[in-house]
A protein has these predicted regions:
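Mid-length scaffold segments of soluble, non-membrane domains
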Residues: 81-163
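N-terminal targeting leaders of membrane proteins
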Residues: 2-85, 89-99, 187, 191-247
Length: 247
């Protein structure tokens, strides 16, 4: 199971929504579960990492997510998610500008100022004022300019990615003010802690959905790969129902 890949699971939850690719369209674009070699040259390595992630999820991550879900009330969990989203604003804003989207950049900036002023980011009054949340990263920016994803990758713990998006993670670090405000060790500690908390929060909201995808798929690896690719394309195109991801 790939914990830190929200787009995969949330896409599956919304796969019946209007606008998402049908199974036939997905097969035409990405191939069926058995047509994997041509678009997944690192499949053997990816499957090994996928199995590692599944084992880690069963042993550690899922139990932590269940505990987090059951221990804290929804308002607390919502505040945690809002705060983490607010921290990611500089990265989102930079990529809004790089993609040439001033309207989305305006929404992002407004969200940051409103939510920071009224609750230090723990609440989300900006959404009620017409500034909904959206997620952007440099991988999406590259994709918006036609850069292909390159080889599909499954990263340890982080889950589905690609050569393009993995490189994008590095660039996004330079957009994050914490990279410059904290020392090297402090920045790494904060980054890891923030990513882990965001992942646990996401996993806690999708426990049953994750279980159902794994149980109902003949080949969970191929299923997750297909879902991730479809959702990633929707994120790049800024379509409705796109899902934030920890990329």
């Amino acid at each position: 199971m790939d914990l830190l890949s929200p787009g995969t699971v949330q896409y599956a939850q919304n796969s019946d929504d209007e606008g998402y690719l049908s199974d036939e369209d997905a097969a035409a674009i990405y191939g069926t579960d058995t047509q994997v070699s041509s678009d997944d040259p690192l499949e053997l390595l990816n499957r090994f990492v996928f199995a590692f992630n599944e084992a880690l999820d069963v042993i550690l991550i899922r139990p932590m997510a269940v505990t987090y879900r059951d221990l804290f009330p929804d308002p607390v969990k919502d505040s945690v998610r809002n705060f983490l989203r607010n921290l990611s604003t500089p990265v989102v804003l930079a990529n809004d500008f790089l993609q040439g989207n001033p309207d989305r950049a305006s929404d992002t900036a407004a969200r940051f100022f409103i939510n920071t002023a009224f609750g230090l980011g723990f609440f989300d009054p900006a959404s009620e004022l017409g500034h909904p949340y959206h997620d952007e990263d440099f991988g999406q920016t590259l994709g918006s300019y036609g850069v292909g994803e390159g080889a599909y990758l499954v990263l340890p713990i982080l889950g589905p990615s690609s050569v393009r998006d993995t490189g994008g993670r590095v660039v996004d670090m330079f957009f994050d003010p914490l990279t410059y405000l904290l020392s090297g060790d402090e920045a790494r500690t904060v980054s890891i802690s923030r990513g882990a908390l965001r992942g646990i929060d996401f996993r806690s909201r999708n426990i049953e959905t994750f279980d159902e995808i794994a149980e109902d798929s003949v080949d969970p690896y191929a299923r997750f790969r297909s879902l991730w690719r479809q959702n990633r394309q929707y994120q790049i195109e800024n379509r409705d129902n796109q899902v934030e991801g920890i990329n």
